[in-house]
Amino acid sequence: MTSLHDRHIKPLILKDLNGDNWHLADYVKRGGYSALRKILEEGIAPEAIIADLKTSGLRGRGGAGFPTGLKWSFMPRQYPGQKYLVCNTDEGEPGTFKDRDIIRYNPHALIEGMAIGAYAMGITVGYNYIHGEIFQDYLRFEEALEEARAAGFLGDNILGSQFSFQLHAHHGYGAYICGEETALLESLEGKKGQPRFKPPFPASFGLYGKPTTINNTETFAAVPFILNLGAAEYMALGKPNNGGTKIFSISGDVERPGNYEVPLGTPFATLMELAGGMRGGKKIKAVIPGGSSAPVIRGDVMMNTDLDYDSIAKAGSMLGSGAVIVMDETRCMVKSLLRLSYFYYEESCGQCTPCREGTGWMYRMVHRIENGHGRPEDMDMLNSVADNIQGRTICALGDAAAMPVRAMIKNFREEFEYHIEHKHCLVPTYL
């Protein structure tokens, strides 16, 4: 297993990396661009590539888990005008840090994956929208783009073929809302980053009103490995409906926080072993399995759960981006929720009234409980506000703010009640 600045990464996507071998020559030595070269030299049909992705079971790695091959098939192939391909590297959710490592340590995997996607969907222009707060990694990706252009893997008539693809990097300004695909498109167009109503969906009305396909960084980076390994073989790495591997960003109270790539369906207990177990030998109390928007799960339940979309959903949460936040027995759930609710209150774009007003209401109520001024009716009021936000906003940020509130109260109600009754925390030591 490779250690990169205390991050421990296992293949496929980040195989054999040492922190310095991110350049084009290094990537080619590892078999890089062989999938793209084979496609262009053999003239493989775009439909065959999309069929392979469907067979592979690859699902979007950004959070929604939508089947990638199916999404690519939505792009109208015979559209007479410009079409666009967009990568969402606007990684801003607390606990998530996998995509920045991909563009830092293996940027050419992303570039090759996007080029293959462009070929499969008949697209000639693409953009990678990179989160504003990862500036050094943005510069790294720009360097990789220059290398790919100079070597003929990007630009006009790639590798002497009739296929042309121009790929550009765009640096965002750090707004969490721009991780939502239509807000990202608005920002990319130079407008205020606010979500659009859907429908129409980006596949029919996307960037500049043109058909657009948007995928996450890890999703694109997986494509070359799928084609090199074989779609069926990639699928077999995981489990039914959960093909391949997934990078999990584990943080919190573990000995070795970092990025770990494991097959989907791997027991959570195995991931904990890879991360060195609980820090200081403490007991596991709670886990947020898919980024800060995913409902919290009690530690004992999570220890008996597998890491795949269906198993996590059955346990009452969602896999999301694969950002696993582990909390030990000393963590106060009220204070943890206070931090989460403040984040969503600050990051709401303000477009929808339920989210704009509701996130503030939830934050202030949790703040009141945490600081010893809670009232018994606050519990029902918090749930009521969350219920009136969820499903009533243009985008999923409202849901992302509401779900942690409901899950924390459901799974750790006793701590909230103790705070309200005794005016202090149930656990003796907390952040």
Task: Label each PLM-derived region with a short phrase.
Residues 1-52:
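Cofactor-/ligand-binding subdomain signature composed of acidic, glycine-rich
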Residues 27-34, 88-99, 202-207, 249-254:
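Gly-rich Lys/Arg/Thr-decorated short loops/hinges at beta-loop-alpha junctions or inter-strand turns
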Residues 35-52, 81-83, 89, 98-103, ...:
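Ferredoxin-type iron-sulfur electron-transfer modules in oxidoreductases and energy-metabolism complexes
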Residues 53-74, 174-186, 190-192, 345-357, ...:
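Conserved phosphate/anionic-ligand binding catalytic regions in large, soluble enzymes, centered on
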Residues 64, 69-72, 96-99, 138-143, ...:
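Short acidic, glycine/serine/threonine-rich loops at helix termini
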Residues 106-120:
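Histidine-anchored nucleotide/phosphate-binding helix
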Residues 113-117, 263-281:
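Short amphipathic, charge-patterned alpha-helical segments
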Residues 138-264, 276:
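Hydrophobic alpha-helical positions that pack around
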